[in-house]
Amino acid sequence: TSRNYLAAAYGYDNRQLQDELRTFGSSTEKHSNALHLGIVGNSRGMGSYTGYSALYYTGRLTYDDINVGNEGTYHKFNTDINHIQRLGHTVNLHINLHSQLASKDLDGSEQFSLGGADGIRAYPQGEASGSSGYQATAELRYATSIANLSLATFIDCGEVELNKNIGDHRNLAGWGVGVQYARPNDYYLRVDYARNLNGEAYQSEENDKNGRVWFLAYKLF
């Protein structure tokens, strides 16, 4: 049997932000107001689960003191798809896809980033940020004989448009292995080791030729 869920999602976001340039001892205040509308849902079948969302945002960003070219009205469309497929008694396949399509070059607070613990793990947090892009992950998880402990191997990839006016893009890809321990409704621990696949160097910090390690911990209260 299968079970499906679908709902409308809508809301209003108001944010008061501040950009600090510590080197120059200056800061800029900015304000963002946005409406979003879309759908969220999931589908459960025999040995599978799929969750998804599609949200359209329309908003306006204003700066208090200066105009850096990214203020004004903007529109963007975000999608998220997460699929889990059971391949056997101890193996599951996890596929994640995230994307953003924007009408213009966006302020950094609205941009889409590829690198990081929840993105392409071979790259630093926030690496390769732009207004439009996608990021995908395919991961195999193996349940061990130790309760709540599993091993993983994964591939991450993605592309982002850095500047709409000149069509500048970056493509990143990486692979890695991980181990996680999860206590349902209590806490979650995970360690990942990742290396890049296409030789694309870091731009946000010095290159790390020996790979990258991430440690994540979540606690439910």
Predicted ranges, named:
Residues 16-149, 153-162, 206:
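C-terminal outer-membrane beta-barrel translocator/porin domains of Gram-negative envelope proteins
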Residues 179-186, 191, 208-221:
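Outer-membrane beta-barrel "beta-signal"
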Residues 169-172:
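Glycine-rich, small/acidic residue-mixed loop/short-helix segments
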Residues 137-139, 174-180:
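Short glycine-rich, acidic/polar surface loops and turns
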Residues 2-4, 9-11, 18:
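Polar, glycine-rich mid-to-C-terminal structural blocks
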Residues 159-163, 197-200:
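Short, solvent-exposed loop/turn segments at secondary-structure junctions
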Residues 7-11, 53-55, 98, 190, ...:
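Soluble periplasmic/extracytoplasmic beta-strand elements of cell-envelope proteins
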Residues 15-24, 189, 193-212:
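Outer-membrane beta-barrel translocator/channel fold
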